[in-house]
Regions:
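Alpha-helical substrate-binding/gating segment
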Residues: 173-182, 188-215
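NAD(P)-cofactor binding segment of oxidoreductase domains
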Residues: 61-103, 137-140
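Catalytic helix-loop patch of NAD(P)-dependent Rossmann-fold dehydrogenases
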Residues: 115-158
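N-terminal Rossmann-fold NAD(P) dinucleotide-binding loop
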Residues: 12-13
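C-terminal amphipathic/interface module of NAD(P)-dependent oxidoreductases
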Residues: 45-52, 249-286
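Conserved Rossmann-fold NAD(P)-dependent oxidoreductase catalytic core, especially the SDR/UDP-sugar
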Residues: 89-130
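Mid/C-terminal beta-alpha module of Rossmann-like enzyme folds, strongest
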Residues: 200-252
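NAD(P)-dependent short-chain dehydrogenase/reductase
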Residues: 145, 155-191
Length: 286
């Protein structure tokens, strides 16, 4: 079968490897010739296109499954909406081939909850950040543009990812701990995390879903910020975390539930908590 990835970065390349190992043909959209060569070296067929330039999207190939995992480049000078909303709408409108199954990676920041309460897929979205607002709008446009007029033939899946960690994604935080840089956030606020391998497994499981749906992708246990950074410091030999106690950072965050992910989508987490996942991520980082 043929697969296409739009946004073949930290998560996308890991999904691509799984698909290649299963014997599928995998293509990925990229804007750069240099990155195209890198993709070829990984066994991935590059497709030179840019979601912000509709005229380039005519080359999108016909595939069986599409993973849309675009992230916003903060150095681009563009607002998140340009990437998440305008880019997605360009893709849906101007791509000549949309598959019968499309998986959209979104984020748990679509929720504006900051009182420490639990959220699930039925909790109303009311994002507090520009990125969260853009992702919430993109989800709405995804259902309208991809699925609404093709309900008999298409299955759309939205995966709202918690904060992703894994090999190579902890270096900046470890460096900050080692330098004893103050953390400007409420130490008692809640964090929701997922190991990258479990997000990849969620994508693979979403290929088997028989109905369109939205899933929160997070591990089994929300964790308070102080516990997370203390654990990270212990595992890396860094000093204990220092929090900036100016009284301004009072948000309690939210606690995400993965019940639907586990019970309905059938994902079996490899790393149910950071006690399982952090040691792997640290030891696998080169």
């Amino acid at each position: 079968m043929r697969k296409l990835i739009v946004g073949c970065g930290y998560v996308g390349r890991r999904v691509a490897k799984e698909w290649l190992d299963q014997g599928h043909e995998v293509s990925a959209v990229t804007r750069s010739a240099e990155n195209a060569n890198t993709l070829r070296s990984l066994g991935i067929e590059p497709v030179i296109a840019d979601i912000t330039r509709p005229e380039t999207l005519a080359v999108i190939p016909a595939v069986d499954t599409l993973l849309y995992a675009v992230s916003h480049d903060r150095s681009s000078g563009q607002p998140p909406r340009a990437t998440y909303v305008e880019g997605l709408n360009n893709f849906l409108k101007y791509s000549p081939n949309l598959p019968d199954r499309m998986i959209l990676i979104s984020t748990t920041s679509v929720y504006g909850v900051d009182d420490g309460s639990e959220v699930d897929e039925d909790t109303p979205t009311a994002a507090a950040t520009a990125s969260g607002q853009a992702n919430a709008e993109a989800e709405t446009d995804f259902w309208r543009g991809y699925w609404r007029n093709h309900q008999e033939s298409r299955i759309g899946i939205v995966l709202r990812s918690a904060g992703i960690y894994g090999p190579g994604r902890l270096l900046r935080r470890v460096s900050s701990l080692q330098n004893q840089e103050p953390i400007s956030a409420n130490p008692d606020g809640w964090l929701n995390l997922v190991h990258v391998d479990d997000l990849v497994q969620s994508v693979l499981q979403a290929e088997l879903a028989k109905e369109p749906d939205t899933y929160l992708v997070c591990d089994d246990r929300p964790i308070q910020r102080r516990e997370y950074y203390t654990k990270l410091a212990e595992l890396t030999g860094a000093p204990p975390p220092v929090f900036h106690a100016d009284g301004q950072e009072t948000s309690q965050g939210k606690r995400c539930s993965n019940r639907r992910l586990i019970e309905t989508l059938g994902v079996k987490l490899r790393y149910p908590t950071i006690d399982d996942g952090l040691p792997h991520a640290i030891h696998s980082t080169t």
